[in-house]
Amino acid sequence: MICRDCPSCAMGWVKNRPEEAWCIGVPEPFHIDDIDMTCTEYFDTPYEVASHTTIQFSPDGNYTPKFIMLVGIPGSGKSTKAKELSKQHIAGKSVVHISSDAIRGRIYGDESCQRDPGKVFSIMHEETINALNSGHTVIYDATNITRKSRKEILNKIPNFVSKECVVCWAPIEVCIERDKARVRTVGENVIDKMLRRFEAPYYDEGFNKITVSIDGLHYHRRQYYIDLLSAINISHDNPHHTADILEHCRLCGIKLIGEAPDFIVNAGFVHDIGKAYTKTFKNHKGEESDIAHYYDHQAVGAWLSYGIEGHSPTLAWLISTHMAPFINQKYYNSLPPLYKSWIDKLHKADREAH
C-alpha cells in the first residue's frame, strides 16, 4: 500500500505494514508508539534465499553449529552483541567468541596494533574452523565491512555449518560519540573511511540468515526518516542531474511503482540518502571543483538505511549495490539472475529520473 501521507509529502513510500503507513507532512499522522528501538532485531527472507545456501547435518548427526559473523563500523555495538551471544550454551557446548582485537592483544600485547593483519586473520580463521569442527557455535568478531573480507572466511566454513550475519547498527553520530568515550579510540577519520568502504552483506555471499541488531539505543524512527529526507532536500550541483536530490529520489521511486516489487520501489525513494553526507566540491584528486561529487554515497546510504524500517537487510543491499553496473561490473556480473534483475530495475529508474 502507498503511504497515506503521500499527498502531503509527495514521496509515495510504499508501506508493507499498517503501522508504517505514514511519512511526513501530516499534523497528526497515524503512527506507532514513539519508538525506543532498544535491543531490537529484525531480518528478512527474500526470494530464493535457499537456492544460494546448503545446510547439512554436523558430523555427529545431531547438532548443526552456527557461524555468526558480526558486521559493523567502530562504535556500532559489536562488542556488546558478542558478549550477549557468548553467554549462551547450545547443545551443551559453549559459544566461542573469536575477536580480531583479542588476537592482536595476544600476539602483540596491544589490541589496537595494526601490524601484519594477514597474520591476525590467518590465526582467526584457523581458530574459527577448529571451533566449528568441534561442534561449537562461533561468534566471529571483526568489522567485516567488505565482501572481500567476509568471503575470505565464508569460503572456508564447513558445509554442515549454518552461516549467519548480524549487522550491528547505530547512527553515524552515535558511533563517533561512543568511540570518543573509549580509552582505545580509532578516531572520527577512521570511522569515516570505514563507512565509505561499507558493502552491505547479502545472501549471495552464502549467508543463511541476516539480522540487524540495534542494541541499547533509543531513537525515534519516524524522526530519523524525516531527518534523512530533509538532509537530501538540496541541489545536486552537478550537470548529470537537473532535479534536486530529494526530487530525484521521488521521481525514481514513482517510476518503479507498478514496475517492480514494493521493496525495490522503497529503495528507489531513498537510494541516494548518502549524498548529503558525501557531497563535496573536490574531485577524486582532492582538487577544488566547480561541481559537486558524491564519492561512496552508496556505501554511506546503505549504512544510514538500516535505521529506517524492518526489512532493511534487503533495502541496504539494494542501496549499496545500485551503482554496481557503473563502478563494480565484476560483482554485478557475478550476481544470481534474480538479484541482477532487481538491480537492473533500480538502475534503470535511477538513470531516467533526472
Question: Where is each model-derived feature located?
Answer:
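Cysteine-centered metal-binding/redox modules
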Residues: 1-58
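Conserved GTP-binding G-domain of TRAFAC-class P-loop NTPases and closely related GTPase folds
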Residues: 67, 71, 173-222
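ATP-binding Walker
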Residues: 76
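Walker A/P-loop
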Residues: 79
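Conserved substrate/cofactor phosphate-moiety recognition/catalytic segment
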Residues: 82-136
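Conserved phosphate-donor/acceptor-positioning beta-strand/loop module used by diverse small-molecule
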Residues: 161-175
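Acidic/His-rich, divalent-metal-binding segments that scaffold phosphate/diphosphate chemistry
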Residues: 213-290
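Divalent metal-dependent catalytic cores for phosphoryl transfer on phosphate-bearing substrates
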Residues: 255-354
